[in-house]
């Protein structure tokens, strides 16, 4: 159904994932103020994977690309790195949606682990090799672990 024929409340709800994605990449929230040193997770990864997997057509790839550009500007990374990562997460989620006959939360969850491992290694390999950015591997390990664990609750 076209977006113009929907009632206003359904239009607003259909834009919810996009708005939430842009809020999450703009604010770059962290739990540093709680003095939890290694507690961080990538909420945009969870959001992009979930809505690419479950919400067909709700998350436009162009808007995901622009969210990655905004994330690069906010964090201070080279432009386009986060966009490639976000779009590769979309590709993995769409692949899983197309091959799945019966959805299962546990299978989706472990495929999400595979996805964030591949995309994070791709992301950090490019950043380290080409742009000589220092990476704290403990933070990266805990970030992937907490992102994986929190996907189950979102």
For the regions a language model picked out, list residue spans one by one.
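Terminal, non-globular segments
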Residues: 1-154
């Amino acid at each position: 159904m076209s977006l113009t024929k929907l009632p206003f409340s359904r239009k607003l709800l259909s834009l919810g994932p996009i708005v939430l994605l842009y809020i999450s990449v703009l604010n770059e929230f962290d739990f540093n103020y709680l003095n939890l040193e290694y507690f961080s997770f990538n909420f945009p990864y969870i959001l992009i994977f979930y809505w690419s997997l479950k919400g067909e057509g709700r998350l436009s790839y162009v808007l995901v690309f622009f969210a990655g550009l905004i994330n690069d500007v906010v964090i201070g990374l080279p432009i386009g790195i986060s966009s490639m990562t976000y779009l590769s997460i979309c590709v993995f989620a769409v692949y899983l949606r197309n091959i799945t006959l019966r959805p299962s939360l546990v299978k989706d969850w472990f495929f999400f682990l595979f996805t964030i491992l591949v995309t994070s290694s791709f992301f950090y390999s490019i950043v380290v090799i080409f742009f000589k950015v220092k990476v704290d591997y403990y933070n990266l390990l805990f970030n992937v672990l907490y992102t994986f664990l929190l996907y189950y609750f979102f």
